[in-house]
Amino acid sequence: MLQTEMKVIQQTEIADKVYELILTGERVADMSPGQFLMLKPSRSDLLMRRPISICSYDKTAKTCILLYRIEGDGTRDFSKLSEGDTIDVLGPLGKGFDIDQTPAPKTALLIGGGIGVPPMYQLGKELAGKGVQVTFVNGFQSAKDSFYEKEMNAYGTVHIATVDGSLGTQGFVTDITNNFPEEPDVIYSCGPKAMLQAVKASFPETKTYLSLEERMACGIGACYACVCPKADDAKKQFKVCEDGPVFRADEVSL
């Protein structure tokens, strides 16, 4: 059973309503880039778990970092956790990013939007460790919403786009990527559906992997709450939590 208790090491608000939650537990040993955890709120009236992507992990220290934004009662409940508290966790879950491709890529473009930025961090770290030249492009609404630029700079070049122009390039992530002189060997992206659609349309010939953000209820493929149409047959569907959340761009219809 993937259900376990994890202990809170530290929690900090790092951007507007965005929290960095550091946990420790035995399940860290099983984590890979692009997976997620289903966290159970402590309030008895909040029955459903909430999916939170894994930002990073240290298997030696048995710690992992989750970044999440307060969106409702569940995530607001998580924001009250402090050092020494425990939380009921299901996971790690899902199929993450393919980082052992053949032939190995020389360059990788990692595109994250909003709360889709966190899983790009561990992915970029591991790709850089394999000798891949990593470029991060992160999109936010405003400077107050941005995070992890310094941390990502340790593993690659970081570009920032904000809708209001308060940090980096004004506009969207594609306003940056469309001006790159060369296409990368591989693209990985996570963020809102509109952003993923734009990324897919901008790089039709490049091997691209998309991590889908969908509302989930069970996290294990039992409830069919997070389905996505297949590209080759719209009548058939993937279960994002079980078959994904990461898919090749040509597999899914967005």
Swiss-Prot record:
Pathway listed for it is: Pyrimidine metabolism; UMP biosynthesis via de novo pathway; orotate from (S)-dihydroorotate (NAD(+) route): step 1/1
The cross-references to Pfam families, in alphabetical order and at most eight, read: DHODB_Fe-S_bind, NAD_binding_1
**Purpose:** Responsible for channeling the electrons from the oxidation of dihydroorotate from the FMN redox center in the PyrD type B subunit to the ultimate electron acceptor NAD(+).
Query: Which cofactor(s) are needed, names only?
Result: [2Fe-2S] cluster; FAD
Provide the assembly information.
Answer: Heterotetramer of 2 PyrK and 2 PyrD type B subunits.
User: What biological-process terms (Gene Ontology) are attached?
Assistant: 'de novo' UMP biosynthetic process
* Cofactor: how bound: Binds 1 [2Fe-2S] cluster per subunit.
Keyword ATP-binding on this protein?
Answer: no
**What sequence ranges are listed for the domain FAD-binding FR-type?**
1-99
Kindly give the NCBIfam families that the UniProt entry links to this protein: PRK00054.1-2, PRK00054.1-4
Q: What is this protein called?
A: Dihydroorotate dehydrogenase B (NAD(+)), electron transfer subunit
Instruction: Please tell me where FAD binds in this chain.
Output: R50, P51, I52, S53, L67, Y68, R69, G74, T75
Name any one GO molecular function: metal ion binding
Give UniProt keywords alphabetically: 2Fe-2S, Electron transport, FAD, Flavoprotein, Iron, Iron-sulfur, Metal-binding, Pyrimidine biosynthesis, Transport
Species of origin: Listeria monocytogenes serotype 4b (strain CLIP80459)
Protein residues bound to [2Fe-2S] cluster: C218, C223, C226, C241
Q: Which gene encodes it?
A: pyrK
**Which InterPro entries does this entry report, sorted A to Z?**
Cyt_c3_hydrogenase_gsu, Dihydroorotate_DH_ele_sf, Dihydroorotate_DH_Fe-S-bd, Dihydroorotate_DHASE_ETsu, FAD-bd_FR_type, FNR_nucleotide-bd, OxRdtase_FAD/NAD-bd, PyrK_electron_transfer
Its domain of life reads: Bacteria
Q: Which family does it belong to?
A: Belongs to the PyrK family.
The UniProt record lists the keyword Transport: yes
